[in-house]
């Protein structure tokens, strides 16, 4: 019975150490991370807007 108790204690220590090393996946860096761009075409539309607002010598190609 003594060997089983020691084995259970060692297993519990190893599991708790693994949890401490890996963490609980709720890190401050994750919470404060910059959100990914939910509108990926925004840069292209901004460029097209600039091209449209600029004075273009060829009106048909400027949109």
Curated annotation (Swiss-Prot):
Tissue specificity comment: Expressed by the venom duct.
Record-level GO cellular component terms: extracellular region
Propeptide residues according to the Swiss-Prot or TrEMBL record: 24-52
Primary localisation category: secreted
Residues modified as 4-carboxyglutamate: 55
Pfam family of the protein (one): Conotoxin
Protein name: Contryphan-Ar2
